[in-house]
Amino acid sequence: MICGIDEAGRGPVVGPMVIAAVAGDGERLLQLGVRDSKTLSPTKREVIYARIIEVADCVNYVVVEPHIIDEYVRRRMLNSLELDFTARLIELCPAELYYVDSPDVNSRRYGDALSFITGRRVVALHGGESVPQVAAASIVAKVIRDRLIDILKREIGDFGSGYPSDVKTIEWLRLGKIPVECVRRSWRTLRYLNT
């Protein structure tokens, strides 16, 4: 069996990052319409997500809150964060082979590190969504993160996308409208706002 692992929310200044793992038959996943989550509308992602849950042998995810991300970033170890949490997911989803979308410029180094830590066969790829299980993990991660962001928006209002390039997000940050625990304090975006 093959397991794919991918993340959603690595770049935003607001909200968590979600890393997901999906193990199962690649052909069955493709029949569901699984492909890179970025190419699917939110509605289509939700529909496919529900189907993934039904047919996959294993679906698991971890939510990495902003304060945890900040701890790693302050030590200049964002890739290590993904390595640590991906290793946890590998332990939770048994498979013969793991395909992981690599955050490291050197995907082989990243895959080798995961293999060493977990004792499992891991192949790290850039743009791993060509592997159905990775594409499915991409959808799961994106749906979970979107749901968490929607909850936050219902609580405090629409702050935009949460990305540093979003003018609305920056304005909300500048005005202090987003709760501190929801913001990645280590992001350069905040340093620029505080100068």
Curated annotation (Swiss-Prot):
A divalent metal cation binds at D6, E7, D101. Keywords: Cytoplasm, Endonuclease, Hydrolase, Manganese, Metal-binding, Nuclease. It is found in: Cytoplasm. Signal peptide: none annotated. It catalyses: Endonucleolytic cleavage to 5'-phosphomonoester. The keyword Manganese applies. GO terms for molecular function: manganese ion binding; RNA binding; RNA-DNA hybrid ribonuclease activity. Pfam families: RNase_HII. Transmembrane segments: none annotated. GO terms for cellular component: cytoplasm; ribonuclease H2 complex. Residues 1-195 form the RNase H type-2 domain. Manganese or magnesium. Binds 1 divalent metal ion per monomer in the absence of substrate. May bind a second metal ion after substrate binding. GO terms for biological process: DNA replication, removal of RNA primer; mismatch repair. Its EC number is 3.1.26.4. Disulfide bonds: none annotated. NCBIfam families: ribonuclease HII. PANTHER family: RIBONUCLEASE (PTHR10954:SF23), RIBONUCLEASE H2 SUBUNIT A (PTHR10954). This is Ribonuclease HII.
